[in-house]
Amino acid sequence: MSCLFNSMSHFIKEDGGPHAIRQRICDYLQNNLPILDGMETRDILQLEAPSYEHYISNMRKSSTWGGAIEIQCACNIWNARIIVHDIRNGNRNNGNNNNNKNNKIEFLPLRAVHSTLIKLDFELEWSGGHYEPCRN
């Protein structure tokens, strides 16, 4: 199972755990639901793989790594705010950004324009090839 989906399962409580989270995200993609404003989901996926269908088929496999596309889908599905800390420089601070060495990316749900609509808020660490949940 991919570390991204395992990490998400620490915060997203879905029957079936990481596998169910992965499948729900793939269903979201397969239904061509929006990832970003202004671009069709199929077009975004075709930038990453030979075809839209190939991307989803491959992502359904437990050995396939997830990334920014899947994180954005999770935000949209579960109305989540997800912050990803880039810790490639070795600064492991579990989300406490007390210096400028920790770069972070904030993912927000596409339709939640007001903070009261966000139902879930969590942070992950990314080391360039691996995701871990931040446990504050």
Question: Across the structure, where does each feature detected by a protein language model lie?
Answer:
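Structured partner-binding subdomains within large eukaryotic complex subunits
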Residues: 101-136
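Papain-like cysteine protease catalytic cores
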Residues: 1-94, 101-104
